[in-house]
Amino acid sequence: MHTMLKKDFWYDLPKELIAQEPAAPRDAARLMVLSQKDDSIQHKVFRDLPEFLEPGDLLVVNNSKVLPARIVGVKQPTGAVCELLLLRQVKGDQWECLAKPGKRMQSGTKVSFGDGSLTAVVDETMEDGNKYVTFYYDTETLYEKLDEFGKMPLPPYITKQLEDQSQYQTVYAKELGSAAAPTAGLHFTPELMDTLRAMGVGIAEVTLHVGLGTFRPVQEDEISDHKMHSEWYSISEETARRIRETKAAGHRVIAVGTTSCRTLEAAAAKYGEIKACSGNTSIFLYPGVKFNCIDGLITNFHLPESTLIMLVSALYGYEKTMHAYEVAVAEKYRFFSFGDAMLIL
């Protein structure tokens, strides 16, 4: 296979096709259905998903919940305004954060948020400029304070404020720790999930805490040189068993989102099968890399030259993926986190 370059994954996207808010209701988003068997493209609506699934199929969703991790505070005693974005828990109440203005927040800097019932102290600055910060609060959990003072860390291309923070959570989100939503799951409603279960489609959960590295552009010209960011994942005993049983019975395992996909493929690559496990993964799926677990994928339309469009190309084929994206632009699909979905089966 020839060396793949970043520019191979470029496509032209008119700005107005970048969705600024989610579809309402959630399952009213459009769904492009791509067949791996005959290369056909169908244009549907997300709530039509049951038409393409069969009893025995297993959907694997990522139950990670987004932290309202962007908090604006004032430095003590100067009163200068600053912002922290919590990236990941280091230990206890110490978090790795992105700080603005970073240069002015050296170790020992104290910051106060809201009514002062949440404070933070900068412990140290890392090589990449990120800070280790310890938080102090008067509630049982830090999350209660973030809920009170924090905002959702929306991707940079979404400029509209959310009417409701829950619009950026999946309906099944429960494990706190993501810096961005696993967006393919935003299209599911409780009713649609009930319909799927009633027809014999299984729904199993994994956890992968999405890091902001998700939005980090690929810098290298040759994509195989790109180093992926690391993210924490976990697969339970029950989910592992259901996946093994689905495969053994000859049914399909369909990942809901690139994060579920990467979780399953990381575990399969590491252990040779899916078993209960947790750890960090920096798996990078791009054309030429073999898939060992999933049979299908539900995902949104991703940024040009992103690792996510590379993942889709790895599963569906490079030429076919880029063609599908051209069709999506021509058909005026909505793109990125709040946009429409694609089903590859």
Please tell me what each predicted stretch does:
Residues H2-L345:
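Surface-exposed, charge/polar-rich loops and edge strands
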